[in-house]
Amino acid sequence: MNHNHMPGADMKVFVVEDSAAVRERLIEMIREIEDIEVVGEADNYDAAVNGIMNTRPDVAVVDIKLADDRGSGIDVLNQVRKELPAMKAIVLSNYATPQHIKASADAGAEYFLDKSADFERFTEILEQMKSGTNAH
């Protein structure tokens, strides 16, 4: 039995973001949504891969640039998807280049959000993912 799981939580989310301020804001935004639980957070590649594998979230919210040089958020997704193919992903980044958007999609991300332009869509997208509707 998973003792970290809140009764009634419909969706478990893991947050991977190198900036503590942004990570805390994302977690605040997630906690405002009913029936969604934050099961972990990380700021670097190893902590992200280990945390996601241990908590097995429904959704990973991943920044591309992480706090170390071991790998990017896209590398994290490529690694954990081998074991968790059903996990959904939202990539959040300041690097909204065609290459990053394509690499995110290739890694299986359902959404790519530009932090400067799309940040406020984050909760709307999580709500839609929770209810099973597609927000594309």
Give names to the regions the model predicted.
Residues 74-85:
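Short amphipathic alpha-helix used as the core "switch/output" element in two-component signaling
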Residues 96-113, 117, 124:
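Alpha4 helix (beta4-alpha4-beta5 surface) of REC/receiver domains from two-component response regulators
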Residues 20-40:
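Two-component/phosphorelay signaling modules centered on CheY-like receiver
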Residues 60, 89, 112-113:
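Two-component signal transduction core modules
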Residues 41-59, 67:
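Acidic, metal-coordinating helix/loop segments flanking the phosphotransfer/catalytic sites
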Residues 1-14, 20-21, 121-136:
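Non-catalytic signal-transmission and effector/linker regions of two-component phosphorelay proteins
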Residues 44, 70-75:
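Acidic catalytic/metal-coordinating carboxylates
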